[in-house]
UniProtKB/Swiss-Prot annotation:
Keyword terms, alphabetized: Hydrolase
Cited NCBIfam families: unchar_dom_1
Protein name: Putative esterase STK_17900
Family: Belongs to the thioesterase PaaI family.
Disulphide connectivity of cysteines: none
UniProt cross-references to CDD domains, sorted A to Z: PaaI_thioesterase
GO molecular function: fatty acyl-CoA hydrolase activity
Native source species: Sulfurisphaera tokodaii (strain DSM 16993 / JCM 10545 / NBRC 100140 / 7) (Sulfolobus tokodaii)
EC nos: 3.1.2.-
Keyword hit for Hydrolase: yes
InterPro entries: ACOT13, HotDog_dom_sf, PAAI_dom, Thioestr_dom
Length: 133
């Protein structure tokens, strides 16, 4: 299985958005991925809160790498929904993704977004299409 360091290196070298966000995976294990990053003004919207698009991106990254631990060749997000519960203002921002159900071709994932006070600020869920060998 790919390690946190390998994923962080791969994405930092190849994905400008991941690099721009300053994101780092703290934990990757079968069916689980945890991502975090600090506050940057460039990631915020008016009012100093984390922009919804950045929250969505963090959830998609987290969910995608939770899914990639399932012995798949590739995986694609088919659908993803986010509920914004509370403004994310206090860093660090942490996103925890868990695969809830896996079939031969699909995975259902839930992702939670927390602020630096460990308060739940966003909840997401999605379906990924799995490509196996």
């Amino acid at each position: 299985m790919i390690t946190e360091d390998e994923v962080n290196k791969l994405l930092s070298e190849n994905e400008a958005l991941f690099r721009f966000m300053g994101a780092k995976f703290e934990k990757i294990e079968r069916g689980v991925a945890k991502l975090s990053f600090e506050y940057k003004e460039e990631l915020s919207r008016i009012g100093g809160m984390l922009h919804g698009a950045i929250i969505f991106a963090a959830m998609d990254y987290s969910g995608s790498y939770a899914v990639r631990t399932l012995d798949v060749k590739e995986a694609y997000t088919l659908e993803f929904n986010v509920i914004f519960l509370k403004a994310m203002k206090t860093p660090p921002f942490t996103f925890l993704a868990r695969v809830v159900r896996e079939t031969k071709r699909y995975a259902y994932v839930e992702v939670e977004g927390f602020d630096g006070n460990n308060e739940l600020c966003a909840k997401g869920n999605g379906i990924w299409h799995l490509i196996r060998d």
